[in-house]
């Protein structure tokens, strides 16, 4: 991921594959990039793809870290728009240009979604080969395999991550999270508590999940509240917390998490948060709030046919 880009020939290949990279006008490139990110976060994937391509077009054939970063965004937008083959082409070009562990991981996820499990697993192996000390990579691979019904085989990646040498607070945070995922709650509590004492606020989040898994609701809620009060919660974590409450039938608490996520400055999963909040309002019987949020949702995501049908249904309530 951090390897220097040295091949002029491969630069030419990537330039052709992605309509050229390298900054001609850094300011203009940054404007296109930021506009693309804004479109991506609002679910306007087609415009995001165009913006990222325009950012890449500000080039003279020279590739740098910024251009690779834009390519990752472009591939994400392509995938979310449903253009999986285009996303695959973009990841192929990145990997051909620079054997990037993150690109192998993301391409592996894409292969899994396309039903090509063998290719996905091969990419995961290459990803950890390139990034042997990246905890998040191991955890991401585990989550992806688990989501595709391969939890037992996926656990080997968590065990590999535990072998990474390091006893700093950040290491303990990741190892505590991994122990939680493996069901080793005693070790998880020990590592996460030490990480928290050394200033890792996110440890409170995983301590909450660990105690919840053990049935200690009071401690779980206490740590989750502490984490929320710290102001470092991400929209993804708030979505997960809200979804858990929604599954348990606590719609008011679910809405607290969903709306807290929507109130953050950066909300890359805004669409999922809004859809879940609408569902929580409906389940709680607050159809007026559901209608209001659904109206806002359709203004941002007008092509969602299911939401359009839901709007028609709510008008009868």
Residue spans for each PLM region:
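Structural marker of alpha-solenoid helical repeat scaffolds
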Residues: 58, 62, 96-97, 130, ...
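C-terminal motif of bacterial Sec signal peptides marking the signal peptidase cleavage site
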Residues: 17-20
């Amino acid at each position: 991921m951090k390897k220097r880009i040295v091949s002029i020939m491969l630069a030419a290949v990537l330039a052709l594959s992605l309509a050229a990279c390298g900054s001609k006008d850094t300011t203009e490139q940054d404007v296109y990039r930021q506009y693309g990110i804004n479109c991506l976060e609002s679910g306007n994937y087609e415009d995001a793809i165009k913006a990222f391509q325009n950012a890449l077009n500000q080039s003279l054939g020279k590739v740098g870290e910024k251009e690779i970063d834009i390519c990752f965004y472009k591939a994400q937008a392509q995938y979310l728009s449903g253009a999986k083959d285009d996303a695959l082409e973009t990841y192929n070009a990145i990997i051909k240009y620079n054997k990037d562990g993150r690109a192998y991981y993301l391409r592996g996820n894409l292969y899994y979604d396309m039903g090509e499990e063998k290719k996905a697993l091969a990419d995961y192996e290459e990803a950890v080969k390139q990034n042997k000390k990246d905890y998040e990579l191991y955890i991401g691979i585990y989550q992806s395999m688990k989501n595709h019904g391969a939890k037992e085989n996926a656990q080997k990646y968590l065990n590999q991550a535990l072998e990474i040498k390091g006893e700093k607070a950040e290491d303990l945070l990741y190892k505590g999270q991994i122990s939680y995922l493996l069901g080793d709650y005693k070790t998880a509590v020990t590592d996460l508590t030490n990480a928290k004492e050394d200033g890792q606020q996110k440890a409170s989040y995983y301590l909450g999940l660990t105690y919840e898994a053990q049935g200690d609701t009071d401690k779980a809620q206490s740590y989750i509240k502490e984490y929320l009060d710290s102001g470092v919660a991400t929209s993804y974590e708030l979505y997960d917390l809200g979804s858990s409450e929604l599954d348990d039938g606590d719609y008011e608490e679910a809405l607290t998490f969903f709306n807290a996520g929507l109130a953050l400055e950066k909300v890359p999963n805004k669409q999922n948060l809004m859809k879940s909040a609408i569902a929580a309002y409906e389940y709680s019987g607050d159809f007026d709030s559901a209608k209001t949020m659904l109206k806002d949702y359709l203004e941002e995501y007008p092509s969602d046919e299911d939401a359009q049908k839901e709007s028609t249904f709510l008008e009868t309530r």
